[in-house]
From Swiss-Prot:
The gene is flp-22. Transmembrane segments: none annotated. Belongs to the FARP (FMRFamide related peptide) family. GO terms for cellular component: extracellular region. This is FMRFamide-like neuropeptides 22. Residues 20-46, 83-93 form a propeptide. Its main location: secreted. The modification Phenylalanine amide is found at residues 55, 67, 79. Residues 1-19 form the signal peptide. GO terms for biological process: neuropeptide signaling pathway. FMRFamides and FMRFamide-like peptides are neuropeptides. SPSAKWMRF-amide: Acts as a ligand for the npr-22 receptor in vitro.
Length: 93
């Protein structure tokens, strides 16, 4: 009887210790995810024009204006669709 009680206590203590270790891992993971979110926010703050300037390219709107063409969004609006990206996602395969 005493051995079974001791074994039960040991099993309970081991399970509690393992639960705490897993909880610490979860807290560390949450901390890493918060750090990743902060890094992503810093990258998102860059304006689209800064991205195009960084690569030495014209912005997409300037490209369409330069050649006197309609922009892709204007083309889709002419045919009654909301945008090119949504039209692609609505296609049946």
């Amino acid at each position: 009887m005493n051995r079974s009680m001791i074994a039960l206590c040991v099993v309970l203590m081991v399970s509690l210790v393992s639960a705490q270790v897993f909880d610490l891992d979860g807290q560390q993971l949450a901390g890493l995810e918060q750090n990743d979110a902060r890094l992503m926010e810093q990258q998102v703050k860059r304006s689209p024009s800064a991205k195009w300037m960084r690569f030495g390219k014209r912005s997409p709107s300037a490209k369409w204006m330069r050649f006197g063409k309609r922009s892709p969004s204007a083309k889709w609006m002419r045919f009654g669709k909301r945008s090119g990206a949504e039209a692609v996602s609505e296609q049946d395969y």
